[in-house]
């Protein structure tokens, strides 16, 4: 969503 990293699919999604 508003993350942009390589973490979980909650707030640190696929660079979205």
From Swiss-Prot:
Residue numbers bearing the Leucine amide modification: 16
InterPro entries: Pyrokinin_CS (IPR001484)
Entry's Gene Ontology cellular component terms: extracellular region
Keywords: Amidation, Neuropeptide, Secreted
Keyword Secreted listed: yes
Protein localization: Secreted
UniProt keyword Secreted present: yes
Molecular function GO terms recorded: neuropeptide hormone activity
GO BP: neuropeptide signaling pathway
Principal localisation: secreted
Function: Myoactive.
Family under the similarity heading: Belongs to the pyrokinin family.
Protein name: CAPA-Pyrokinin
Organism from which the protein derives: Pachyphasma brandbergense (Gladiator)
